Amino acid sequence: MEQNLPFVNVGFIDNAYNDRVLPLLGKIDNGHLFKWFLVLIWKIAALAFLLGGVYLTIAGIFGDTGYIKMNITNELFSGGQKAGASFGLVIGLVLSLVCAWYLYSNTKKRTDELNSQEYGDLLHFIFLTMIPRTITLAGEIAFTLIMYAGLMQIIAGLDGAAAYAPLLSYGDLFMQIPGVNMAAALVPSSVHGNYDNFVNDMSMGIMGVAAAFFVLIAYYIYREIYNYGMKLVCALIAFLPRLALPIAIRKKAE
């Protein structure tokens, strides 16, 4: 046991030093603390998708600005529109809960994969291990939300009134996240339908579903470009010592 204070042994201080301080410094030195923190961020994000999604789904139904007040009991709507909005509520409630669960499950899977990766050093872990997986996860999140928006628009077009899509509010949040914000514009703030505009409503929904796949492909291409760029950087760094030696010899000869 290492002594903490100079010239004197104090049992509980020495115990705290050896049991708390030294192990923490060891985790910092070997990088386990950095890896734990980065993985923790992903774990929190996964839980936020699940709990936040459930909260938004339940909370958005009620209140003065809730779906029921704005669509089902709205005196400006006809009986047919209210019936359609009721159908949109049931389907939207189920799909929103499924979407929240899927976002959680997807993020949890990627978090487990990140946690299983070996930690060599901080730069390698961030730039070669974490960022490519972050790009993949961002693409999958964007794909899920755009697919969700497209399906909700199709439901709204079919019922001729509205569809309950509370998770569309995630689009405003993702506008602040680098990497995801470039697809956030494809997630509308709300979806509505009208039989007078049936063809356009259905076309928008189908285009949204198709766009989800194109966005996912774009993110995977983005990841491949990033990986290729990192290979070039690593190759350049490895080549620099070989380049420096002839230059040094030439300068010495001069």
What is the role of each PLM region?
Residues 2-45, 72-83, 104-145, 241, ...:
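Membrane-interface extramembranous regions at the lipid-water interface
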Residues 2-5, 203, 207-254:
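Extended alpha-helical segments
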Residues 28-39, 69-92, 126-129, 170-215:
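Membrane-interface segments at the starts/ends of alpha-helical transmembrane spans
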Residues 39-61, 139-153:
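Canonical alpha-helical transmembrane segments of integral membrane proteins
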Residues 54-72, 150-180:
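Membrane-helix interface motif
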Residues 86-108:
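Hydrophobic alpha-helical membrane-embedded segments
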Residues 101-113, 155-163, 221-240:
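Juxtamembrane/interface segments at transmembrane-helix termini
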Residues 134-165, 220-227, 253:
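Terminal helix-to-tail segments of small alpha-helical proteins
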